[in-house]
From Swiss-Prot:
GO biological process: isopentenyl diphosphate biosynthetic process, methylerythritol 4-phosphate pathway
NCBIfam families cross-referenced by the UniProt entry: ispD
Record-marked site positions (Transition state stabilizer): R20, K27
Keyword list, A-Z: Isoprene biosynthesis, Nucleotidyltransferase, Transferase
Protein's name in the database: 2-C-methyl-D-erythritol 4-phosphate cytidylyltransferase
Gene: ispD
Protein source organism: Shewanella pealeana (strain ATCC 700345 / ANG-SQ1)
């Protein structure tokens, strides 16, 4: 049985603009309970004792990151990201220690907690190939056609919402992600790059409040979750 990885870093792809929020600034810099969404995300990662470094991939025209109080943290390193999430993650992987494992976490998931990080790190003993956080699907799932008509009810058994962080050995993730992008594969998260390479990642049940802020209504929900966690 494998042991817990000795060296762990975190990667935060933060080069996106979040157009679905309809905001004038990238969504990761919107204010949420007195600081930015990205600030909450970084606070959780930077304060975790097992994470040695946090690498943030930024848009080359980013003018907001340097204003964050977390920007000068000793454990933080910024790199230039790419057009797509996968490009940003790959950029960060190029400066990551090759003997480390990487926790890749969405910039716009500010409600992450240390307990879920601990569970994912500990899962390396059971899933030496890597694993992701997930939440079991609770609702009835429907498939529709182009006209918006229901064509099928999908069995939700063994269906999961993929969350982040996603946790993989740096060297393996870098190679598989690079190869997948070179082949023109559609890569939506790190697990999909590993799956493309024939690897079956593990899945670890995480908290359902680890939501991604994508639409305006998500801000209110994230605010409630953060306030509840602080009590």
């Amino acid at each position: 049985m494998s042991q817990t990885p000795k060296h762990i870093i975190s990667i935060v792809p933060a080069a996106g603009i979040g157009s679905r929020m309809g905001a004038e600034i990238p969504k990761q810099y919107l204010q949420l309970n007195e600081q930015s969404i990205l600030g909450h995300t970084l606070d959780c990662l930077l304060s975790h004792p097992s994470i040695e470094k946090v690498i943030v991939a930024l848009n080359p025209e980013d003018e907001f990151f340097a204003r964050l109080p977390q920007a000068q943290h000793a454990k933080l390193q910024a790199v230039i990201g790419g057009k797509e999430r996968a490009d940003s993650v790959l950029s960060a992987l190029t400066v990551a220690p090759t003997d480390a494992w990487a926790l890749v976490h969405d910039a716009a998931r500010p409600c992450l907690n240390h307990q879920d990080i601990d569970k994912l790190i500990e899962s390396a003993s059971s899933f030496p190939q890597g694993a992701i956080l997930g939440a079991p699907v609770r609702d009835t799932m429907k498939r529709s056609n182009a006209q918006g008509l229901i064509t099928e009810t999908v069995c939700r058994e063994k269906l999961w919402h993929a969350l982040t962080p996603q946790f993989f050995p740096v060297q393996n993730l870098k190679q598989n992600l690079s190869n997948a992008l070179a082949a023109g594969a559609l890569i939506t998260d790190e697990a999909s790059a590993m799956e493309w390479a024939g690897v079956a990642p593990g899945i670890v049940a995480g908290r359902a409040d680890n939501i991604k802020v994508t639409h305006p209504d998500d801000l209110q929900l994230a605010s409630l979750f953060l306030k509840s966690a602080a009590q």
